Amino acid sequence: MFRFRRIAAHPKTDDLRVFLSSGTTSSERSVHAYGDLALYDAAARASARHMLFPDVEKMRLVILAPHEDEAPSSSLEYMLARFADWFGTQCTWVWRDGALDLELLTEVLRQAEASKEAVAVLGTSFAFVHVEDGLGDRRFELAPGSRVMQTGGYKGRSREVDPEVLLDAIAARLGVGTPRIINEFGATELSSQMYETTLRDDIGGALGPRRLWVPPWVRATPVDPDTLQPVHGETVGILRIDDTANLDSVCCIQTADLARRLDDGIVVLGRAPGAPPRGCSLAADQALGAQ
């Protein structure tokens, strides 16, 4: 819907910020116009505080994504810039002019390693894939308290990666335990984000299965692809998200992602058969693959 119509409760002249989807799989790009970002900011800050930074007020951030000045229409880059404001003691953006600066990344991580300063490394899944491709035998032992947030899917421009293989590779590369490597689920069409629970579980000493925590103002429901009615138990369906932070547009979003319920959360299993890959991770792979 967002690809075909501008959907907003305010006139176009009152747009404060307009986010566009990556436009990687279709000539039409989803358009999400905001007349006010206060609710978006409140939702993003509350979720990240609860799931990504529950044990620290601020820490050093290393970001494997463009700065919002380089990608002003990206909701992900906007969110990461706000994370730098809210949660960063200092922040290094290692994506410069459409490419990852692997030498800068190495320098920053070596500095953190030497000073025993915990860091949060944030980026798309395929940015981490390209880090794996480019760093060779360089390995790090980041300080206790360090963490990783990856976002986006695992199907890129020319290949698909196994999420478990990537998880283990990131852990081995950075010296961070796999429970402290979590996935964030978001979209241009949404104002809220969902995060995997293992970091918070690990901090609390009660590690459970990987699943996405759903904020209390969001409802995530797997539905039958034929009837669009909710499925029961752990039956796989396509994910519907009701996001009340989308106050100025449409709250109910029907995705093409496969999902099932698990305990108190949701497990996303990838795109439904026949659905085109999309999103920030695919865009990162396309940009970096062109280097």
PLM ranges: what are they?
Residues 20-25, 196:
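Hydrophobic alpha-helical segments that mediate membrane insertion or helix-helix packing
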Residues 34, 65:
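Alpha-helical substrate-recognition element adjacent to the catalytic core
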Residues 57-60, 67-69, 73, 81-291:
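Active-site glycine/GP-rich loop and adjacent strand/helix microenvironment
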Residues 1-3, 77-78, 82:
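Short, hydrophobic/amphipathic alpha-helical patches that form generic packing surfaces
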Residues 1-20, 28-33, 40-42, 46, ...:
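Active-site diphosphate/adenylate-binding microenvironment
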Residues 36-44, 72, 101:
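Phosphate/oxyanion-binding active-site loops and adjacent basic polyanion-contact surfaces
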